[in-house]
């Protein structure tokens, strides 16, 4: 039996090309350089994120320390439009108040405080 096993091993020789391909495919290298490069990359990512987080925290802290009464251009534009509207209302009110209509004797004249009551409904009436 020993002779037949040796004959089978001699006949079943693997070509050199196939051996080299198998060696390359099933290679076992030292993984230390790869592990170190991944470790360095992870450390760089952590340091960069910590740096960005710190900058964000400091920016938020500085923004809170600055005075809040600074007006943005949008606020200034809104203030201008409100002032123009108020000026036109004041002008309209002055012209209407200065021109007093001829009232017949005995007709009551509406005052400014009465006009708000006339035009606005009672809150109790709107609820029911």
UniProtKB/Swiss-Prot annotation:
Sections of the chain in a coiled coil: none
Sequence intervals crossing the membrane: 31-53
Membrane topology according to the record: Single-pass membrane protein
Catalytic activity: taurocholate(out) = taurocholate(in); tauroursodeoxycholate(out) = tauroursodeoxycholate(in); glycoursodeoxycholate(out) = glycoursodeoxycholate(in); glycocholate(out) = glycocholate(in)
Compartments (UniProt record): Cell membrane
Expressing tissues: Present at high level in ileum. In ileum, it is restricted to the apical domain on the mature villus enterocytes with little detectable expression in the goblet cells or crypt enterocytes (at protein level). Expressed in kidney but not in heart, brain, liver, spleen, embryo, lung, thymus, ovary nor testis.
Induction: Positively regulated via the bile acid-activated nuclear receptor farnesoid X receptor (NR1H4/FXR).
UniProt-listed InterPro entries: OST-beta_subunit, OSTbeta
Keywords from the UniProt entry: Cell membrane, Lipid transport, Membrane, Phosphoprotein, Transmembrane, Transmembrane helix, Transport
Domain writeup: The transmembrane domain (TM) is the major site of interaction with SLC51A. The extracellular-membrane interface is absolutely required for transport activity. The intracellular-membrane interface is necessary for establishing the correct membrane orientation that is essential for the heterodimer Ost-alpha/Ost-beta complex formation and transport activity at the cell membrane surface.
Subunit structure: Interacts with SLC51A. The Ost-alpha/Ost-beta complex is a heterodimer composed of alpha (SLC51A) and beta (SLC51B) subunit; induces the transport of SLC51A from the endoplasmic reticulum to the plasma membrane.
Free-text function comment from the UniProt entry: Essential component of the Ost-alpha/Ost-beta complex, a heterodimer that acts as the intestinal basolateral transporter responsible for bile acid export from enterocytes into portal blood. The Ost-alpha/Ost-beta complex efficiently transports the major species of bile acids (taurocholate). Taurine conjugates are transported more efficiently across the basolateral membrane than glycine-conjugated bile acids. Can also transport steroids such as estrone 3-sulfate and dehydroepiandrosterone 3-sulfate, therefore playing a role in the enterohepatic circulation of sterols.
Name the UniProt record assigns to this protein: Organic solute transporter subunit beta
């Amino acid at each position: 039996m020993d002779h037949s096993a040796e004959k089978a091993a001699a006949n079943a020789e693997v070509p050199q090309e196939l051996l080299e391909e198998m060696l390359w495919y099933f290679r076992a290298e030292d993984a230390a350089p790869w592990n170190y490069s991944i470790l360095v990359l992870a450390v760089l990512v952590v340091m960069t994120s910590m740096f960005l987080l710190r900058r964000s925290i400091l920016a938020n802290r500085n923004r809170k320390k600055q005075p809040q009464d600074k007006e943005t251009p949008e606020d200034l534009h809104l203030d201008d439009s409100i002032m123009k509207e108020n000026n036109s209302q004041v002008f309209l009110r002055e012209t209407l108040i200065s021109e007093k209509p001829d009232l017949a004797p005995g007709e009551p004249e509406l005052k400014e405080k009465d006009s708000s009551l006339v035009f606005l409904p009672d809150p109790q009436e709107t609820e029911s």
